[in-house]
Structures are given as C-alpha cells and as structure tokens.
Amino acid sequence: MGLPWYRVHTVVLNDPGRLLSVHIMHTALVAGWAGSMALYELAVFDPSDPVLDPMWRQGMFVIPFMTRLGITNSWGGWSITGGTITNSGIWSYEGVAGAHIVLSGLCFLAAIWHWVYWDLEIFSDERTGKPSLDLPKIFGIHLFLSGVACFGFGAFHVTGLYGPGIWVSDPYGLTGRVQSVNPAWGVGGFDPFVPGGIASHHIAAGTLGILAGLFHLSVRPPQRLYKGLRMGNIETVLSSSIAAVFFAAFVVAGTMWYGSATTPIELFGPTRYQWDQGYFQQEIYRRIGAGLAENQSLSEAWSKIPEKLAFYDYIGNNPAKGGLFRAGSMDNGDGIAVGWLGHPVFRDKEGRELFVRRMPTFFETFPVVLVDGDGIVRADVPFRRAESKYSVEQVGVTVEFYGGELNGVSYSDPATVKKYARRAQLGEIFELDRAALKSDGVFRSSPRGWFTFGHVSFALLFFFGHIWHGARTLFRDVFAGIDPDLDAQVEFGAFQKLGDPTTKRQAV
C-alpha cells in the first residue's frame, strides 16, 4: 500500500499495539532531546557571574526550567546562585539530564517491543476477537493518573513536604532562591505573580482530575452522546488531545511573555513591558529618593543600587529588541556585560538636571533628546547642525556619574557628553565585552522571546489541527462521500485503513 507522506499515520489507525509503540517512541525522542540539550547547555554554560552573565543572557533554554523546579547545583561543583559546593546530590543538573537519557533509552526499547509484539490480548474485544479499545475507560484512567500527578506536584513538590519547593523571588528579581511554598487558598491565589497559587491550583486541579477520572471509570457515556461525539473513533481522541495541547500552549505563551510566578525574571530575563513601563527605573529612583531622605549623598545613594537591578534596567535585556530570526544568545548580540559604569546625570550650564529620553522598544534608532524635570526639551544631538538650537555645545551640557565604576567622574567635553547621552537612551550604561564571542552589536532576544514565539506558532498550527481532525471525525460519513441512495450498507469504522479491500458490503 503506497501512502503519501501526509497519510502515513493511517498505518496505526486500527492497530492499538503499534499506536502505543509510536507514542512511546515519541516520548523517547522528547526525553532524549531534553537530556541531550541539558548536557549541551551545561557544557557551554559559564556559571561564574550570575549577576551580569546569567543563564538567560547566555541563551540557556532548558536550564531555567530545571532551576525553577528546584535544581540549583552541578556535579561540576558550582551553584546557579554563585559560589562552590561540595555535595550536590543525585538531583543535580547532570543527574536530571542523565535521568532523561536513561528514560529515553528505556522508552526506545519499550517502543520496539510493542512494535514487534503488537497483537496483544488486551487490545482485542473478547466478544468479536477484533482490535478494540474502550476509549471512555482509557480516558478515565489517564484523567485519574494525571490528576494524581498534578495533586502530588502541588501538595508535595511545591510545598516542600516531599521535594525541594520551587524558585521564588521578589518582584524585582533580586533575591531569588529555591524554597517551599504554602498554598494560597484566598483571592490572592489568583494573582499570577503569587507563587502560592501554583501549589493551590495544582492541588485543586489534581483533586478535580482524580474525581473526574473516577467518574469516567464508573459511569458509561449515554449512547446518543457516545455516537454524537464519535467516542468510539480514535480520531476523536486525536482531535481532543490536540485541543488540550494548543490550549496549554497559548496559556504558557501568555504567562511567559507577560510574566508570572512561573517565569521568574532571574531565570528567563525581564519582560518587554518592564522596559516599556520603566518598571526597574521607578524602583531605582524610589531607592535613591529613600537614600536622599536619610541624608545620603547622591554618590552614596547610587552606590547602594544593586548592580543586578541596574542591569535589568538596560534595553539590551528586553526580549522584544531581538529579531525573531536573529540566531544566538543575547551575549552574541551586544556582548558580555563586564561592569556597570554608573548612572549619568546631565546638567546644562544653568545647573538644571536633564534626563535623556529612552528608546522605545520598537525603534532601532531614536533622536537623542534631553528634557528637564517638567518634560521641556533643553538639549539634543541635532541631525542638522546648521539649524540646531539645543545642541550639547550650545546648551553647555555636562555629565557626572554616580555609583558604578565611574563614580564621581564628570565630563564637559561635548563629544564625550554626547557619547554617554546616546548610551543613556538604552537605560543604565554598562561596559560590554564584544570581543570574547565576536558579538556583532545587534540585539538578540532572550529565551523568553523564543519560548513565546515557538509556543504561539505551534498553538496556531495545533488549533488548525484540532479543527481539521475534529471535522474529519464528526463528519466522516459526509467526507467519505456516502450517497443517501446507496444500495449497499457499508460498515464504516470496522475497517478504516486506506485502500482496504476487505470492508464488508451487504445488500440492504
């Protein structure tokens, strides 16, 4: 039977043993990829600077997911939070990677076994002796088991009752660590940034899954519903499974792009909205204001700003700045951050403090404009010098640094002032090493951007797949071209493989 490539899956349509086999093989491939990718990332990951060169700057994709579930140590003697360790235990990054590879190998062998021994008694209807699956019962079994796993994750792993807990941090991504989390049963549990909601929702959803699974195991569907939804057809299972997957993909794309407790910025990088709203800038200025209120000097107040917080307030860490098709990590774009130069404060010759307008997310170039505290333009870097009124030279702008490596240093040379004004458009100013990785200076997206793009793309594709297979299973008789005046009764569903000449025909 010669099948075109897009119809090859029909070979497992009426073959439960080999249908199981190909799904086990799929699990083997997924687990094998995860373990192999983890080992590759561990081979290239540099854990030496968790502040200025964190995992998301280095383009790590699977390490953040392991970390948020409680893995922080490596058999190489390092910890993701910095420093060294002597005993990382079995469940290190390498241990998790190895477990996935072992699982992959076992699933590979199981898939081969089920492919060879496909005709098992368990798949046969004892009354007819033909291949048959009790799909509503199988649905109940899967629902029950997934409910147990969901409940167990929320009640034991996340809470730390039997497990490490999960990664929890403050709203500004400064104090993150793995810790146990108590379930949040009140209204606060519905806040996407409250970690307790992860525990409570898994416990609640798991309980619901267990009860629903028991219901479907003990109650048979009504005949009309069974026939109306084509519950005896394996393509119905495919359609509804695709629906579950694309719905989940849309949900996680949203929680990743907009941010939530499940996607900490220390592991996946900041969101674009934190740049758009000046989220970190506002916190920095709040801290400076608090320092000045305690009679600290500007220099002292800025010196107490954590370098980690300042680094978040840099446009190069905005996942929307990198093009979707620019390959490579953020470090391959603008370089590896080496140090914070400090916060530049610009003043004109009258002593007014000036603020550089920051570049919006979707601009590649942006005019350098300096405004005063009231938003009035006082200086700029003009495009045409002949018509300039507010040039740095004419206005006499100077710059002084507070905090960072240039703390206390000031410049009045117009060329230097303009250089730092241009860099201040991009947020806090950092020294970046572009030589080490031969970085090209073009911004890249973070794993947050890749994950979102990938999951939205596949969700749209799977949405189409759900509609396609749902329509096929609901309207199979229509698509098969059955003539209402057909004089031969054809038993559809008993034999569905393409080109099968043995379908029973019986005169009416």
Curated annotation (Swiss-Prot):
It comes from Pelargonium hortorum. One of the components of the core complex of photosystem II (PSII). It binds chlorophyll and helps catalyze the primary light-induced photochemical processes of PSII. PSII is a light-driven water:plastoquinone oxidoreductase, using light energy to abstract electrons from H(2)O, generating O(2) and a proton gradient subsequently used for ATP formation. Binds multiple chlorophylls. PSII binds additional chlorophylls, carotenoids and specific lipids. One of its GO terms (cellular component) is chloroplast thylakoid membrane. It is found in: Plastid, Chloroplast thylakoid membrane. This is Photosystem II CP47 reaction center protein. Its main location: plastid. PANTHER family: PHOTOSYSTEM II CP43 REACTION CENTER PROTEIN, PHOTOSYSTEM II CP47 REACTION CENTER PROTEIN. GO terms for biological process: photosynthetic electron transport in photosystem II. Keywords: Chlorophyll, Chloroplast, Chromophore, Membrane, Photosynthesis, Photosystem II, Plastid, Thylakoid, Transmembrane, Transmembrane helix. The keyword Nuclease does not apply. Belongs to the PsbB/PsbC family. PsbB subfamily. The chain crosses the membrane at residues 21-36, 101-115, 140-156, 203-218, 237-252, 457-472. SUPFAM superfamilies: Photosystem II antenna protein-like.
